[in-house]
Amino acid sequence: EKIDIDNANKLGYKIKLLGFSELINNQVFQRVHPTLIKKSSYIASIDGVLNAVIVDGYPVGQSVIQGEGAGPEATTSALVSDISSILRGNIKFPFSISNKERKKLNYKSIDDRYFSAYLRFEVLDKPGVLSNITNIFSKNKVSIKRLIQNPNKSKKFSSIVVITHNSKNKSLNKVIKQIENKSFVVKKPKLIRIGSS
């Protein structure tokens, strides 16, 4: 929503739809979601039809691959090119290795992974609401790094933005579920994870 884009901008972030894939101890963690990224980061500068892939490996560090890949023309061109190459036999192993050489990996939930997050709550502007919200954070062991309350007297509600310290994804989701069921909530809460780079 526009309010989240504006809030992100004020906090020094941009919102990007990012995909992540990590291999840790033979376990694959994959996720795709909107992410708050610092405006100063490289990935924040990728706009328009450009896409980027950042590979972080040991000992080489980060490698960046960037090119056109969004929008109807760029996407169609890339798909037709890849399919043509595979059909012509130019790409023998589309996944870089033969099917026999592939090994089975375990896919893991991100519930136990830790993230810093941006949460926004639209609530009735009345006494006790803020303390009720912060108590739910405390009960779920989610530490608040920053809290911003923007009252809107004409509509008698308030927008509360919370930035958290690193917390378990499972705990962040519990906070959202417990708060959204409260009678003082006027709109579904928003959660956006914050990227580290």
Residue ranges and their predicted role:
Residues E1-S45, L50:
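Substrate-binding/catalytic subdomain of NAD(P)-dependent oxidoreductase enzymes
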Residues K16-L17, R31, I54, V64-Q66, ...:
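Structured core elements
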Residues I43, A74-A78:
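A short, polar/proline- and glycine-enriched secondary-structure boundary/capping micro-motif
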Residues A52, Y58-V60, F93-P94:
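A glycine- and small/hydrophobic-rich beta-loop-beta segment
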Residues G61-S63, G67-E73:
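Glycine-rich phosphate/pyrophosphate-binding beta-alpha loops
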Residues A78, I83-S197:
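A conserved regulatory-domain signal marking ACT and ACT-like small-molecule sensing domains
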Residues D56-S63, R113:
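Short acidic (Asp/Glu) and glycine-rich catalytic loops that position anionic groups and cofactors
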